[in-house]
């Protein structure tokens, strides 16, 4: 393998070997603590614009399994591992990870001290970086560092969202027709609109398990477009980037909130809302809350959160670099979950309308299923609302 280098914005250089595509890439360097689930990480749209470091030292053991993908492609900017397995073993394996990275044109680096890198990011905060391969040694000049520092994740939701409305058997993973997690049955009880800001495949899977018809719509849809579909519930999906950048979407979510407030006042049908990750942040912003960037984010499948009402602690899967500020929440926004490590907001219940949201991923693919019951709560909100009207 040829040499590769990771150059951080502060001038720190890590030397390793090239994996995946050869070339260079710039992104926000982050780390994830997941021991497994690297395929879900690679195909999670929430990693758009980021160079992802796997803290677990050996990656690729079970190869590439298309059934485990969480979106149509890799959206991350680069990939960092300590050691890449070249001889995977799994009865479902279709190729090795290095070949897949090449096919997705993902520039990566292996054989670096990922523990030292993770400690640096933990102590200094996430920072931009550049992976360079195919050269003997990088020339570290101010112009290069300025280029790295200037990088910003932009147009993230626009890039990862679906471009068209999908429903029923249209919503199939095109490249792998044998996968049926987006083929829905016909005996539906309820209709849910999934507003796609970078949705992982496991979100509609979980809704379909609960006998819901799921209509996936692009980020560019308006509140009126969604209400014309006459949904029983609205799911606000996960996604990448700074939530505050999505001013247009936030304004449309505010209209949905106002629709529910008006419907409740007039005795009409309300539409329950459930937000996950970015969807949680966007709903909070639409309701007057504020968000801020975390020092190094929460990424991985082992993050403890505490439920305020019961005091129970759940282990959750997380992938976010921003959080809703807990201080001075509006009176109608009740803190439902908080992070046991740093006390940041992990969930909000809105008392004036049938809406709630969580920062973590209850669909957890990969990761723990401790909070899978939140999908049941969403469905129950919908059924209760339908029965009441």
Where are these regions (language model features)?
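A glycine-centered loop/beta-turn motif at secondary-structure junctions
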Residues: 347-389
